[in-house]
Amino acid sequence: NLYQFKNMIQCANHGRRATWHYLDYGCYCGPGGLGTPVDELDRCCKTHDDCYIEAGKKGCFP
């Protein structure tokens, strides 16, 4: 969810940039996702997206 996304971004960037700067960052931070993550932060967003996809397959929508 967006609250978790905000916390993840703040932890990853140590508060250097506002969270909203990352709503359209790389290939996976923000809605959708396709391709190869551009860096560690984008890879973290991909992992988060993948987790939601797997949870949805099991009928769980956190």
UniProtKB/Swiss-Prot annotation:
Molecular function GO labels: calcium ion binding; calcium-dependent phospholipase A2 activity; phospholipid binding; toxin activity
Cellular component GO terms, alphabetical: extracellular region
Active site: 48
InterPro entries noted in UniProt: PLipase_A2, PLipase_A2_dom, PLipase_A2_dom_sf, PLipase_A2_His_AS
Record carries keyword Cytoplasm: no
SMART domains tied to this protein: PA2c
EC numbers on record: 3.1.1.4
Pfam families linked to this entry: Phospholip_A2_1 (PF00068)
GO terms of biological process kind: arachidonate secretion; lipid catabolic process; phospholipid metabolic process
Enzyme class: hydrolase
Keyword set includes Ligase: no
Residues that coordinate or bind Ca(2+): 28, 30, 32, 49
Catalytic function, reaction form: a 1,2-diacyl-sn-glycero-3-phosphocholine + H2O = a 1-acyl-sn-glycero-3-phosphocholine + a fatty acid + H(+)
PANTHER family associated with the record: PHOSPHOLIPASE A2 A2-ACTITOXIN-UCS2A-LIKE (PTHR11716:SF106), PHOSPHOLIPASE A2 FAMILY MEMBER (PTHR11716)
Role according to the record: Snake venom phospholipase A2 (PLA2) that inhibits collagen-induced platelet aggregation. In terms of inhibition of platelet aggregation, superbin a is more potent as superbin b, c, and d. PLA2 catalyzes the calcium-dependent hydrolysis of the 2-acyl groups in 3-sn-phosphoglycerides.
Entry similarity comment: Belongs to the phospholipase A2 family. Group I subfamily. D49 sub-subfamily.
Full protein name: Phospholipase A2 superbin a
Organism: Austrelaps superbus
Higher taxonomy: Eukaryota, Metazoa, Chordata, Craniata, Vertebrata
